[in-house]
């Protein structure tokens, strides 16, 4: 559905992305209490929920983003309101419906996760500035991330980023080449982490 609506990506890779999001996203097991003792006494570190999180979704990775964010955010005791990208609204809404149905069947309250039904830049901005929102998580282009970071609220921004690959003398060069090409072409390179190789490689 995401490939059809957005016109981007590769179906087989999107299936794998969803599976990885379901199986590898940290859940409640990640949130443990730690005690640190030293010369100055004992410190107890315990994570606490923010409350309601506004999650701004991208068009490049809409379904896996909803799955990933739902798991880690509700595991932390939060509720989530998703703001779909206009180019991926149908698949984002459908994913939220499916995940909320599963949560409801597991005993979660209605509305633990939801999505904006009216999708627009104004609606997204209204969500981010709502007094009911305690944290913003924005995945998208520089403009969206900038808006989240300048909202005056705690925000996590994930914009485009292309990390370099360092292939040094300890590498299996043939395998490194295969892995670099596979990673850079995965889902037609939509995940904003495509690699490039510096010509000044030490190999």
Spans of features found by a protein language model:
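N-terminal Rossmann-like NAD(P)+-binding subdomain of aldehyde/semialdehyde dehydrogenases
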Residues: 1-43
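A structured beta-alpha segment of the ubiquitous adenosine-cofactor-binding alpha/beta core
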Residues: 31-45, 113-133
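ALDH superfamily catalytic-core signature
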Residues: 75, 145-203
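Short acidic loop-to-helix transition motifs that present clustered carboxylates
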Residues: 118-122, 142-144, 162
């Amino acid at each position: 559905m995401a490939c059809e609506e957005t016109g981007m990506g590769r179906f087989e890779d999107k299936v794998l992305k969803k599976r990885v999001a379901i199986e590898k996203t940290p859940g409640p097991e990640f949130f443990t209490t730690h005690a640190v003792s030293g010369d100055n006494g004992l410190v107890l570190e315990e994570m606490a929920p923010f409350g309601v999180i506004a999650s701004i979704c991208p068009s490049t990775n809409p379904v896996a983003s909803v799955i990933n964010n739902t798991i880690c955010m509700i595991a932390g005791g939060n509720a989530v309101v998703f703001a779909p990208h206009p180019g991926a609204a149908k698949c984002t809404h459908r994913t939220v419906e499916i995940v909320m149905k599963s949560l409801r069947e597991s005993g979660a309250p209605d509305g633990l996760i939801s999505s904006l039904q009216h999708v627009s830049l104004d609606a997204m901005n209204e969500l981010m500035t709502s007094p009911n929102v305690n944290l913003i998580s924005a995945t998208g282009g520089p403009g969206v991330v900038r808006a989240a970071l300048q909202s005056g609220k705690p925000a996590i921004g994930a914009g485009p980023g292309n990390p370099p690959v360092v292939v040094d003398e300890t590498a299996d060069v043939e395998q490194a080449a295969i892995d670099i090409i596979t990673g850079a072409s995965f889902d037609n390179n939509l995940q904003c982490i495509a690699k490039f190789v510096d010509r000044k490689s030490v190999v």
